[in-house]
């Protein structure tokens, strides 16, 4: 039984997408390295009065504070924002905010785009070209989301202390919240879809033309033979 191009694409996507997500998670550490490097450059260059260090890898702790495992895809921040970490009613005990951010939350666009590209019936050279252009753009969008969350944790979640630090740095809390929502809710799904559509317009136009032609062909009927009168 012959499949239409759309069905062949959907079947290929059904096979390639799980594989792409598996590879993405298996190589999570190396794949987030460019993102963390970009985030480090932006945070330490733009707001050195807030951030002192950005490092890759963090320990996963249990409720008792014991190390369960070291996760190489996490990102650790060191800041200059000081908060009171003492229990309510206890003597003040101050410490710097050192949050951990998970860049993978913003990175599922990469396997989604890769799976769609691999499922599209184009030449191998064009597939490689799409990945070579698309992956760096996805890393930039991913870094935008990570930066938004980093600022949100340090300046919004920290309460009044964070608000004061934001005012000193000339940052708007509303703008930070907007950037965080945009980077978390919109970019991870929008970027791979737009990239795939832009890079594969010929294939999409083929699908549209075929869908427009097939219903017309299905309505054709043969003219009845001439009667004998």
Name every feature range the model reports, one short phrase each.
Residues 64-116:
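Individual transmembrane alpha-helix segments
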Residues 165-220, 229:
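Primarily interfacial, aromatic-capped hydrophobic alpha-helices that serve as membrane anchors
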Residues 26-27, 117-124, 197-204:
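Structural signal for the C-terminal ends of transmembrane alpha-helices
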Residues 143-166:
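Juxtamembrane non-transmembrane "cap" segments at the membrane-aqueous interface
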Residues 108-112, 118-141:
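Mid-length scaffold segments of soluble, non-membrane domains
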Residues 2-18, 125-137:
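Alpha-helical transmembrane segments and their helix-start/interface "positive-inside/aromatic belt" motifs
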Residues 16-28, 132-151:
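Hydrophobic alpha-helical membrane-insertion segments
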Residues 6-63:
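N-terminal signal-anchor transmembrane alpha helix
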């Amino acid at each position: 039984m012959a499949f239409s191009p759309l069905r062949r694409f959907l079947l290929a996507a059904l096979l390639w997408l799980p594989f792409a997500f598996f590879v993405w998670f298996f190589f999570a550490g190396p794949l987030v390295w460019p993102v963390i490097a970009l985030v480090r450059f932006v945070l330490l260059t733009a707001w050195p009065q807030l951030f002192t260090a950005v490092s890759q890898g963090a320990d996963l702790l249990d409720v008792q504070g014991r190390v369960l495992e070291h996760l190489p895809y996490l990102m650790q921040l060191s800041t200059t924002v000081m908060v009171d970490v003492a229990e309510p009613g206890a003597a003040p005990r101050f410490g710097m905010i050192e949050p951990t951010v998970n860049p993978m939350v913003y990175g599922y666009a990469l396997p989604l785009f890769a799976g769609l590209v691999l499922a599209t019936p184009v030449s191998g050279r064009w597939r490689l070209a799409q990945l070579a252009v698309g992956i760096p753009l996805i890393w930039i969008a991913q870094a935008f989301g990570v930066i938004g969350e980093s600022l949100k944790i340090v300046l919004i979640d920290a309460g009044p202390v964070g608000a004061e630090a934001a005012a000193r740095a000339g940052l708007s809390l509303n703008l930070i919240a907007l950037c965080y929502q945009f980077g978390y809710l919109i970019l991870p799904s929008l970027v791979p879809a737009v990239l795939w559509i832009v890079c594969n317009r010929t294939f999409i136009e083929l699908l549209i033309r075929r869908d427009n032609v097939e219903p017309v062909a299905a309505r054709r009927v043969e003219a009845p033979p001439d009667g004998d009168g």
